[in-house]
Amino acid sequence: MKAAVVVANEDVQYQEVEEPQVTPGHVKIKVRYSGICGSDIPRVLNHGVHFYPIVLGHEFSGDVVEVGEGVTKVKVGDRVSGAPLLPCMKCDDCQKGNYSLCKHYSFIGSREQGANADYVVVPEKNAVPFADNVPYEQGAMFEPATVAIHGVFQNDYHGGEYVAILGGGTVGMFTMQWTKIFGSKKVVVFDISDERLALAKRLGADEVINTKEEGYMEKAMAITGGKGYGFVFETAGQVPTMHMAFELAANKAHVCFIGTPHENLTFTPKQW
């Protein structure tokens, strides 16, 4: 099969590789769509992988073409999306249902071969069926959509507040839409790209602000009557936006870092 293989830092090659074999409890998926996550960029450009060679890709959709022994909930022909986290299911955190806190986890497309290939094999529980009327392109967005809603749920989210979304990427757009769905006084998306901000408006943002423009902070605070934002979601994983999150926050606000930073982050005592 063909695959996009990361063979070294800054070196991705389109190669012919051996097809993965189905094992008990696993399913083989013919990949239709596989997204490039922001976290994949440092994996390719900044020595961010665990080993070479590796096939990235953890946001994907496709068709089940083969099932292993013992598989009962997924069948050949099912249209599925992939859930990439592979918790150990044995540690204290897993036993409490806190799978994202597992310290012994694996991850499809990072610690295991991923979906930037013709086929990928995953555990049955990580293949999530979706309806025939859902396009494969949308099915591949399952993972970032759940990342966003997890961040919202972890912050005791409630409506009636001003909400700031820092970063207009995929996860930022989903976070904006979830907070709109669950109710908000006004949701404002912040980014440095006018193109992304225009998309945010089309997808439902009440206001958008380009943080490269002079006076953006005054404009942002004016929207809230000077009180700040009750919920601030940082989704870009960048040091400047993580600092900005606290500047925008109202008293007793919820500040959530969904984005993953790849540089050292420090705060002054005054900022904290």
Feature map (PLM): residue ranges:
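Short Gly/Pro-enriched turn/cap motifs at secondary-structure boundaries
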Residues: V7, E18-E19, F51-G57, I108-E112, ...
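Glycine-rich beta-strand-centered segment in the early N-terminal region that forms part
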Residues: P20-S34, H47-D92, A131-N133
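Cytochrome P450 core scaffold surrounding the K-helix E-X-X-R motif
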Residues: S39-R43
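Short glycine-centered segments of the SAM/dcSAM-binding site in methyltransferase folds
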Residues: R79, Y162, A253-H254
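NAD(P)H dinucleotide-binding glycine-rich loop of Rossmann-like/cofactor-binding domains
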Residues: C88-L166
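Mid-domain Rossmann-like dinucleotide-binding core that forms the NAD(H)/NADP(H) cofactor-binding site
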Residues: V134-E214, E218, F233
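Glycine-rich cofactor phosphate-binding loops and adjacent beta1-alpha1 units
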Residues: N155, A198, L203-W272
